[in-house]
Amino acid sequence: MVTSSNLNVIFESSSLIVAVGDATTETLLSLGFPPDIEVVDGREMRVKRDPPISNYESLIKVNNPNSCLTEEALQAVSDALSKKMPVRIFVDGEEDLLALPIIALYPIGTIVVYGQPRVGLVINCIDQQIRKSVITILNKMNVTL
């Protein structure tokens, strides 16, 4: 079970926390861990919902259809690092796959949190091993960063 005390242990060593997904962002906010970058689409398991209420400073809007990684979305992931934080990337379409370029591009030590439907939160601390695995997946998808 995710609690603020066990998240505190995980998050204390990271200078950047990224949430991918509306429910994931909402969970982190409710536990007192506002993400530095949140990627949301106003949907939960493809059902329309209100996006989480958060105090983001910068907003990037992109189009990214289901099961795709568009150039526009990839650029937004890259651009978010240079915006005033916290940043919301709002996706018209689907945000799920954006965890992959985030893991491939963001600094080592970044915490990336996303949801596994009907299971719970997945928390990854970017290291060289996970980055290499994700780049292999992106290459198989013919995605160039």
Identify the residue ranges that each predicted region occupies.
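Charged phosphate-binding loop/patch that engages nucleotide di/tri-phosphates or the phosphate backbone
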Residues: 126-145
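Conserved mixed alpha/beta catalytic, RNA-binding, or beta-rich assembly cores of soluble enzyme
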Residues: 1-131
